[in-house]
C-alpha cells in the first residue's frame, strides 16, 4: 500500500483504487484464519491482497476467465470483486455458471465472498455513469447497447437467485456504502442505515456525473419506506454451501 501522501499526489484513478486503504473496509470486518487458501478473482496486487497476506493467508490472484479453467484445486475462501462478462446468455445465467464453478473449487466448509454493484443502485438514478459501460442510465434501462465482452450488474433478487441455484444454502447480504469500491460503512439486514446517515454520496472518483437530485433526501425516503436493500449501490455477499452461521466470521 502506498502512503496516503503519495496516493493523493497521483492523478491516476487506477493507483487510487489499488492502494487507498479505504478499500480495506470491504473485508476488514471479517476474520480470516492464518494460512487460509484464498482465491482472489479480478483483484490485482492491491491493498486488499496485502491486508490478507499480512494476516498470513495464502493468496492466489486470477481473472474471472482464468478462474473457470482451474481444476484440482481447493480453496478455503474465494473472493470475487466486481461484475462478470455475460456473453450470449442472460446475465443471471452466466453468474450462476461462475458461482457453480466457484462452489466446486471451495473446500467443504469454504466461503464465497462476492462484491458487486447493484444495477438498480440509487447513484445510477441520481446521475452516476454505469461502472461497466461508462454510460448514463444503461443499467437502469437493462443494458440495451451492451456487447458480449462488457460486464453487467444484476439486481439483488437476481444475484441471490444465481447464488441459490449454484448450490449455496447460506447467503448473507451486506450493504457497502457508498459502494464496494470505497466503502466507508458496511450495513446488514440486522443493522440497516438510519435516516440521515447516508450523506456521503458524491464519490465519483472515476468519472464525471450529474447531480439530478439530493441523494441524501432520496435515501432518507427509501429508508423510511423500508426498501433500502433494493436500492443499495452495492452488495457484499458471504456464502456457504451449508447453513453454517456467518457470525463467527465477523469481528465486529
Where would I find each of the regions flagged by the language model?
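C-terminal lobe and adjacent flexible extensions of AdoMet/dcAdoMet transferase-like proteins
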Residues: 177, 183-252
Amino acid at each position: 500500500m502506498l502512503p496516503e501522501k503519495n496516493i493523493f499526489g497521483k492523478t491516476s484513478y487506477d493507483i487510487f483504487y489499488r492502494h487507498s486503504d479505504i478499500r480495506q473496509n470491504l473485508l476488514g470486518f471479517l476474520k480470516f484464519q492464518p494460512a487460509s487458501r484464498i482465491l482472489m478473482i479480478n483483484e490485482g496486487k492491491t491493498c486488499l491482497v496485502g491486508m490478507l497476506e499480512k494476516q498470513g493467508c495464502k493468496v492466489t490472484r486470477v481473472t474471472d476467465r482464468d478462474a473457470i479453467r482451474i481444476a484440482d484445486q481447493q480453496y478455503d475462501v474465494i473472493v470475487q470483486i466486481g461484475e462478470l462478462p455475460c456473453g450470449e446468455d442472460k446475465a443471471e445465467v452466466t453468474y450462476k455458471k461462475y458461482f457453480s464453478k466457484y462452489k466446486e473449487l471451495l473446500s467443504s466448509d469454504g466461503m464465497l465472498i462476492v462484491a458487486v454493484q447493484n444495477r438498480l443502485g440509487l447513484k445510477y438514478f441520481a446521475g452516476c455513469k454505469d461502472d461497466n459501460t461508462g454510460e448514463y442510465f444503461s443499467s437502469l434501462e437493462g443494458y440495451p447497447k451492451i456487447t458480449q465482452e462488457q460486464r453487467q450488474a444484476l439486481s439483488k433478487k437476481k444475484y441471490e437467485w444465481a447464488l441459490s441455484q449454484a448450490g449455496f444454502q447460506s447467503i448473507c447480504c451486506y450493504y457497502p456504502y457508498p459502494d464496494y469500491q470505497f466503502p466507508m460503512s458496511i450495513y446488514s439486514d440486522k443493522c440497516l442505515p438510519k435516516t440521515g446517515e447516508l450523506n456521503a454520496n458524491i464519490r465519483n472518483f472515476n468519472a464525471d456525473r450529474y447531480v439530478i437530485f439530493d441523494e441524501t433526501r432520496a435515501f432518507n425516503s427509501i429508508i423510511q419506506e423500508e426498501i433500502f436493500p433494493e436500492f443499495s449501490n452495492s452488495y457484499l455477499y458471504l456464502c456457504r454451501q451449508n447453513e453454517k452461521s456467518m457470525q463467527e466470521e465477523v469481528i465486529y
